[in-house]
Amino acid sequence: MNYSENILGTIGNTPLVKLNKVVQGIDALVLAKVETFNPGNSTKDRMALKMVEDAEADGRLKPGGTIIEGTSGNTGMGLALAAIVKGYKCIFVITDKQSKEKMDILRAVGAKVIVCPTDVEPTDPRSYYSVSKRLGTEIPNSWYVNQYDNPSNALAHYEQTGPEIWEQTNGKVTHFVVGVGTGGTISGVAKYLKEKNPNIKIWGIDTYGSVFKKYHETGIFDENEIYSYITEGIGEDILPKNVDFSLIDGFTKVTDKDAAVYTRKIALEEGIFVGNSAGSCIKGLHFKPDDVVVVLFHDSGSRYVGKMFNDDWMRERGFLDEEITTAGDIVKENTSKNLIIVRTEELVSHAIDRMRQYKISQIPVIDVNGFVGSVDETDLFQSYVTDKNVADKPIKDVMGKPYPIVKLSTPIEEVSKLFNRETQAVLVDLENGKHHIITKSDIIGSIK
């Protein structure tokens, strides 16, 4: 019979899959090392188990102990699987930018999860680096993993991932491309492959807001390179000991938008449901026809269903390249919402209350015959300057002209021309007896 003694025996030997549609225009053979086939659905299973086994061997991790680590989610999952099989407890410290799915998954496998702010310095006592390190000193019989500086991280990929890639390509691999976070994957694989063939190029994918690319090119740790970014799993505001820059031939930086867009393309065009660091890798590809390129896909798209695989999340960040050409394109996501109005017989105070409640600045005014006027913040301010008791006046005493009404098919250029000092909004006829409003901010928001 052929079976594993436990789930840890299924780690590794993940497949290489040829990429086709998503790499059109790239003449090279591009192969994806799909690490989602690991039991914890990420490449981090490899180094998590290796770090645990090495800590057991030298006595850092003792029976019944508690494993403590700062993680973006995937390392935590790998450590949790090892802890379940081997009988340890887990406490994981994670940043608030990580997906809810990652946090829920860690809790599902028995870990205690502590969430820390993202936008703080690494040395700040609130950072997930500092909190995890502190817990490692405070909790009895605990072991702080520190994947960033733990040599077993890179060693796992030197012993496993590198040899797998070499054997699966029959030694024909010319380039290895991977997102860089802790540095263990790129450094471990690079060391093995360059020992086999020094001409193999190792390329790291970095993100804007991270220090890796500039440090590799100049040797300067530039704090001006550090700012918040959305992409998970790659980039850092520190220099982990596991990043061996001498083994890396170059870095390419990829934007948050490109990472998200290309992650969706991989799922739609290749049927490979992977995380957003995979999208970063694909966007960074530029090679020659004879090259054999191995791109490592870190983790599963299931960790990101509430983020780049969610249209609303993408749209809120301007990541969806939707073509907006008509008034209908602007209002299509809001057609089910009721238009906020005020009636001529109501008071100015009623309009003010609705502006506050719905956080809007313009309101159409109606009577029994339809739209007869409008009121906006400018109208109210000017009325208040001349009459401090304006709130008690009928709205018809302060209203301006009614907003122009356009069809759903009206070109956005024509809609834009209707805006001026007196016209702060335009109404769209939804052709079902209802209307919706377009404001200047809606027009600006449609600009790509």
Task: Label every PLM stretch briefly.
Residues D379-K396, I443-K448:
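A short, polar/charged loop-to-alpha-helix boundary motif
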Residues I340-K359, V365-D367, Y384, I405-Q424, ...:
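The conserved cystathionine-beta-synthase
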Residues L247, I324-L339, E346, D392-Y403:
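Bateman (tandem CBS) regulatory domains
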Residues S361, V372-L380, H435-I443:
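Short hydrophobic beta-strand motif reused across regulatory alpha/beta modules
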Residues A83, I165, M355, I363, ...:
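Terminal peptide-recognition signature
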Residues M1-D329:
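PLP-dependent amino-acid enzyme catalytic core
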